[in-house]
């Protein structure tokens, strides 16, 4: 295994802030729903300046770390917020076969849902609408990096915990 990359430029290279007709934008919409659920202290932890950016397959290199990752720790969220993060995970895995999605969920849970960290990037906001186009979800054995600027590119890397 290793990381996978997917993307879509629905209406051309430079999409509008609403990403009309983009096949994967629903994933960012769901992540932004989590953002809307956060309170002041949580927002401060989750909203960062600039993302890691694209670095080929190293964009989603796994660190194996449970602490010191970018963003807010899912373990510090309320139960309803955690539930919504799991909906984000479900959306990330929706394009894949059911058996592959279930195996991926098993690996993510083995690394600890509470050890996932969710971050959004204000310096890469298309349209200055505070609907965050660039965000990531990272844990010890999973990284999802979503870049919706100028169109959607997304990376996903999940491995069995070591």
Q: For the regions a protein language model found, what residue spans apply to each?
A:
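A cross-kingdom marker for long, charged
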Residues: 1-162
């Amino acid at each position: 295994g290793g990381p996978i990359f997917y993307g879509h430029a629905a209406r051309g290279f430079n999409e509008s802030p609403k990403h009309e007709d983009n096949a994967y934008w629903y994933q960012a919409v769901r992540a932004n729903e989590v953002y809307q659920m956060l309170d002041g202290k949580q927002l401060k932890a989750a909203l960062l300046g600039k993302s890691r950016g694209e670095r080929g397959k190293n964009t989603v290199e796994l660190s194996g770390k449970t602490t010191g990752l970018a963003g807010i720790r899912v373990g510090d969220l309320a139960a309803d917020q955690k539930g919504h993060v799991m909906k984000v995970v479900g959306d990330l895995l929706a394009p894949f076969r059911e058996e592959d999605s279930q195996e991926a969920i098993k690996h993510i849970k083995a690394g600890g849902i509470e050890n996932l960290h969710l971050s959004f990037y204000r310096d890469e906001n298309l349209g200055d609408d505070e609907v965050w186009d660039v965000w990531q979800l990272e844990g010890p054995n999973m990284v999802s990096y979503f870049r919706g600027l100028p169109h959607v590119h997304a990376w996903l890397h999940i491995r069995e915990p070591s």
